[in-house]
Amino acid sequence: MSNMVEVPIFIAILSFIVMCIGELLAYYSVSLKYKYEFEAISFGFIFGVATLILIPKSYSNMFVLYVILGMITVYLIEKYLAYCPLSKKYCVECDNLEENRIKFIYPISFFIHTFIDGLIIAVSYISEIGLPLYLAILMHKLPAGFVLISPLKGVYKNPLYPGVFVSFGTVLGTIVGLVTLKDVSTKILLAFSGGVFLGAFLMLAPHIYEHKEEKTFLYILLGYILVGIIALH
């Protein structure tokens, strides 16, 4: 493995570690005081990466089709595979059906999310985008780990075991992406990734307003501006 290939692997491992730290904080009930502000900045960053870097660099014949496919992929995952008990006013006294969904469906849907993060890291390396995409993944890992473990504490004796497995999806996705995507057109990868990021922003950013309406737009704008500054260099 060349030194260059080691970079995305390092980013994937770092993402795994950061997410595990978020899980530990949730496990020991350490509050993330600015969790929603940080998430808002990361969503703005994701939106900026999609609209200022990925989609413009993917311009080619039929690139819009792949952007739309990326957005549809996110929509289908959110609609049919994703499950978040926190959005359903989760409590430890849920009935057995709800408990089983939290115990099994929730971590599986989260694993899909982390695996896709890994694929995006691989795309960042293959397409030579580098830093902006790496940061977009890293920035939301701490709150993601916190959100993952919070409901699992009510259904697992030790929720860190499934948490670590879910977090490892980023490393696994990166390895799979580096092996399987290297011969795919860079333009297609960039367009599809741009669609994924744009879809993720449109699906997830509104949830921030449910928890933190105050100054949310400003935090999203800050994340977007950060990408603009990076894109100029």
Swiss-Prot record:
Subcellular location: Cell membrane
rRNA-binding listed as a keyword: no
InterPro entries: ZIP
Assigned keywords, A-Z: Cell membrane, Membrane, Transmembrane, Transmembrane helix
GO MF terms, alphabetically ordered: zinc ion transmembrane transporter activity
Secretion signal span: none
Entry's Gene Ontology cellular component terms: membrane; plasma membrane
Highest taxon of the lineage: Archaea
Residue spans crossing the bilayer: 7-27, 36-56, 62-82, 119-139, 159-179, 188-208
Pfam families the UniProt entry points to: Zip
Topology versus the membrane: Multi-pass membrane protein
Entry's Gene Ontology BP terms: zinc ion transmembrane transport
PANTHER family: METAL HOMEOSTASIS FACTOR ATX2 (PTHR11040:SF198), ZINC/IRON TRANSPORTER (PTHR11040)
Name of the protein this chain belongs to: Uncharacterized protein MJ1036
Protein species of origin: Methanocaldococcus jannaschii (strain ATCC 43067 / DSM 2661 / JAL-1 / JCM 10045 / NBRC 100440)
